Amino acid sequence: MHPLELFKYCPKCGSSHFVVNNEKSKRCADCGFVYYFNSSAATVAFILNERNELLVCRRGKEPKKGTLDLSGGFIDMYETGEEGVAREVLEETGLKVEKAAYLFSLPNTYLYSGFLVHTLDQFFLCTVEDATHLEAMDDVADSFWMPLDKVNPEEFGLDSVREGVCLLYT
């Protein structure tokens, strides 16, 4: 099912005459409003400690519960990518990001509450203030440092994270 099929009413006037305009938008036949279905912005953090180990998390919730992941998540309104990745790292691990340097982005899909969300995942290389006080919080079941030679991209559950790990470490 195309994500636009789930939108039945115009978000501007509430009309049920909300019809497909093209493959990425719907148009209201009553008020003329055009809604474009765009990707949601998300972040992913590559964090290395002083032993050159990668910070890895285990997903505590679906999708892909129990698989490996990197810290990150959706960017809130009015946040920059750097602010979003710093907030997500703090919420999930308790670590405070000192610096976030943009690396690259990858498209992804993410099943959230039964709804397929298209995302644009922005990858950052982050440094943290103190890597010794690591916790697993929020939607993370576990977080730990993994030696780079033990990193196996196939153990990462989300497609974009797996691809990002491949780009950076293989």
Residue spans for each PLM region:
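Short functional micro-motifs and their immediate structural scaffolds
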Residues: F18-V19, Y36
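Conserved N-terminal beta-strand and adjoining loop/helix that marks the start
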Residues: D30-L54, F74
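Active-site-adjacent beta-strand/loop module that shapes the phosphate/pyrophosphate-binding cleft
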Residues: F104-T132
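NUDIX/MutT-family hydrolases
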Residues: E135-V165
